[in-house]
Amino acid sequence: MASDPPQQNGSNGAGFHEPHDSQTEPESEPETLPAPPSEVAELVAACMRFVASKYKVALDGTPDTLSLVDQYIREARIAYQARPESIDLVAPAVGAYLGEVMRQEFAAEWFAEGSHEAWRLYFHNVFLSFNPVGIAREAITMKDEAGWNAHLTLDPAERELIDERLAAMPDVDEDEYYLPTTRFDVITAVVETLRAHAEASGTGDVTFSREDYD
């Protein structure tokens, strides 16, 4: 695999640029996340290369760029029909990129050891985990991928709350249902709902680490 692109000032180790306003200092410093595991960073860089090569546009790790990843997935679906093995190259790269966008947006940590099936993203401020690579595989195949853990792992006591929230979301067609942007919107709704519930129940200051998910 080719080496990662050089990091810019303010990058987080995955090639993502951390926003910084040189004119106005924030009142409080946001949580600083460590760089992702090297296995993840390499795949993020690969996704950036794939998209830049095809569309001549650079991904920057922000949620706004997921619409471009959606288009890449649509083309990957066509390639998958002709060459099913292509999913083993594309899904890990797209999953790593999507997972890293979510990690930066919502504060989470990677478990990226062993096979890609075992990878997880563990959230810090809510009890939530899943496998972003599994989400990427389902985006390509447009069906549930058994054993890839793309489903949401939640506190059982909060499952009904989240089921109700997801049931209230607008319907989307099959093409959009599995796309990265739709998945990001779902995770946003889940995180916001769980945070509101935690604040209302007086547990808003509780955080989670990887050990809490064992």
Language model features by range: what are they?
Residues 63, 206-209:
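Short glycine-rich, low-complexity/disordered patches
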Residues 3-91:
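N-terminal low-complexity, intrinsically disordered segments
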Residues 89-132:
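Aromatic- and glycine-enriched beta-alpha-beta binding-site module
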Residues 8-13, 105, 200-202:
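Intrinsically disordered, low-complexity segments enriched in small/polar residues
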Residues 76, 101, 105-106, 139-143, ...:
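Generic structural signal for hydrophobic core residues of well-folded globular domains
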Residues 136, 211-214:
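C-terminal structured domains
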Residues 2, 123-206:
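A recognition module on extended beta-rich or small alphabeta surfaces enriched in W/G with H and D/E
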